[in-house]
Amino acid sequence: MQDFQNYILGAWEKGKGTETKLYNAINGELLGGVSSAGIDYEAVLNYGRNVGGPALRKMTFQERGRMLKALAFYLLEKKDAYYNVSAWTGATKIDSWIDIEGGIGNLFANASLRKQFPDLPYYVDGVAAPLSKGGSFIGHHIMVPKEGVAIHINAFNFPIWGMLEKIAVNLMAGVPAIVKPSEYTCYLTEVMVKDIIASKILPEGALQLVCGLGRGIIDHVDARDTVTFTGSAATGKVLKGLPHITDRSVAFNLEADSLNASILGMHATPDTEEFSLFVKECVKEITIKAGQKCTAVRRIIVPENLIDDVQNAISSKLEKTKIGDPAVEGVRMGALASKLQVERVRESVLALEKSQNIVSGDLESFDVEGADKKLGAFFSPILFRNEDPFNNIACHDIEAFGPVSTIMPYKDMGEAIELAKMGKGSLVSSIVTPSNQEARDYVVGAASMHGRILVLNKDCAKESTGHGSPMPLLTHGGPGRAGGGEEMGGKRGVLHYLQRTAIQGHPTTITAITEQFQIGAEMPEANPHVFRKYFEELVVGETVFTHKHTVTDADIVNFANVSGDNFYAHMDATSLDGTIFEQRVAHGYFILSKAAGLFVDPKKGPVLLNYGLDDARFIKPVYPGATIGVRFTVKEKMDQEKRSEDDIAKGIVRFLVDVYDETGETVALATILTMVKKLDQSK
């Protein structure tokens, strides 16, 4: 018998004895045992805080992003081994793809977020707040990595995705993790973590693994730490309410299984493509991962005049679904994760059956391909029908965490929304309809009790990721029964692991802290011109003060002729009554164009190109006779990795373009983005 191990304190260790025996979900074969007994969790937490944390916090967001990208590519090369082990969980190839490659996709997605963060170990949040009349005192916000650990207590259904979707976020933020997968499928998590540790891509202490029961794993958490829990609502609420969690104000994110609903719109009649899409989506959500998904469709809400059509269509497809060993050709649904899960789902089905009828499937009589039904953890797809869902409410309270769903009728969209909300808070719902108005009515009406809503129609179906797939750049979580938590969500998720702190001081001081130029800070004159300097030589705040240009009527006419912009305010002085303008006004885009002519040093140098313009604002009208100049300031610098050995080493520099007139007042502001060559071409 194999003993599955924990990775703690920089070493692989077995726990004392055997807490749990693990079995192959397909054939019942004993795989081994696992234990976390004897682990000193206080030492484990301190190892993450004192070893992994400092190493991650020294890295910039750009470096952490590149680290995640490297890890993603590394794990993709190893994926075949994960598929082999994933089969032990009862998963089909498609199920495993969601878990393995879907999980790795989270690493890629979070790595790409580095473009949204500064080239710093911490994040500068929002814009400065002016706090004084003279401008010598301002406020801002920074967000620094929390100095604790992220403890992730995960469910059995996605041993890889469940880990990677969480650690991708905390690692990007600069926070180490301790992962506790479900003991029942921890063997798959262990295989991947062994590869992660062997790769040495993550700094030591950034990731630890506890494969056993993990009793005591959150006993020593404090305000620096974050606990995330994915699993049953009952267990999650107990953990979240522990006195030391509340007394120490420990951040706790709860993502619980929920009674998600899919709604067939009233316009999606059997002759529409949307009807077929709805049936296909419901069948998929019942059978993929054998229904063991926190986002699976548990309630199928359809117009009362279409309930028979929908029932017959779904039942027909479910009855044709082959159950068994995924290695056998034609098998479309594997096993539940364990015999224990079979018993739990069976109990829930029997409880539901007291108030509604099974119209497809059977608890006892079903065929299994290539395996022994008695040895494996197999379960038949079950479809219930509830004729009176407003009074027979068990379907809104009891979740059978397997291939089980209930179909129910509604009279109008108001009823459909009310039924969806009777789940008391869900991770996701979906509506399938060809009507945009119907979609809008549902989304606006149901959104308050749902974390995500999919609107599906024939126009997006080909590329839709489906009802049950949380996306790394969108939030995952939900109100009420779903736990009230939120994870992933791209940049939003990363911010959960950062502490926001308000800072106050002189603009020059705030510039030094944020490494972003703040209005009112010192502006030392650049010498030589900033376009003559390489990336490493540029200093935030240094400024080019340009020569001046007096705007003429000819400038306005010539720009109108070149651009084709003959808007009346620029060209017809007789049409200005009732406007804010005193006379014909120069084009805002002319002002910025002329500003470029003033601040650009035209000779070939380190500046490779200008690739964008952000935050352009035209603040004050410029009339013929006004004289403009430019304060051209290094606003922010961001390193950029080389894409290949032959690539030019470069960085991104953002310059503030402050155009002012003869009174000294700003007339236009913009930020230009440039690529600037580095002196050191080796990295």
What is each PLM-predicted segment?
Residues I26-G33, I201-E204, A223-R224, S316-K317, ...:
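Conserved C-terminal structural/oligomerization subdomain of aldehyde/semialdehyde dehydrogenase
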Residues D577-E636:
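Hydrophobic beta-strand-centered segment that forms part of the acyl-chain substrate-binding groove
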Residues D195-K200, T226, T235-F390, G414, ...:
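ALDH superfamily catalytic-core signature
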Residues V530-V540, F618, V622-K683:
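HotDog/MaoC-like acyl-thioester-processing domains
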Residues L30-A37, G52-R57, L131, I151-H152, ...:
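Short, well-ordered beta-strand elements within core beta-sheets of diverse protein domains
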Residues M1-G135, K320, A337, S448:
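N-terminal Rossmann-like NAD(P)+-binding subdomain of aldehyde/semialdehyde dehydrogenases
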Residues P118-L277, Y410, E463, G485:
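Rossmann-like NAD(P) dinucleotide-binding subdomain of oxidoreductase/dehydrogenase enzymes
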Residues A526-A586, K678:
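Catalytic strand-loop segment that frames the active site of acyl-thioester-processing enzymes
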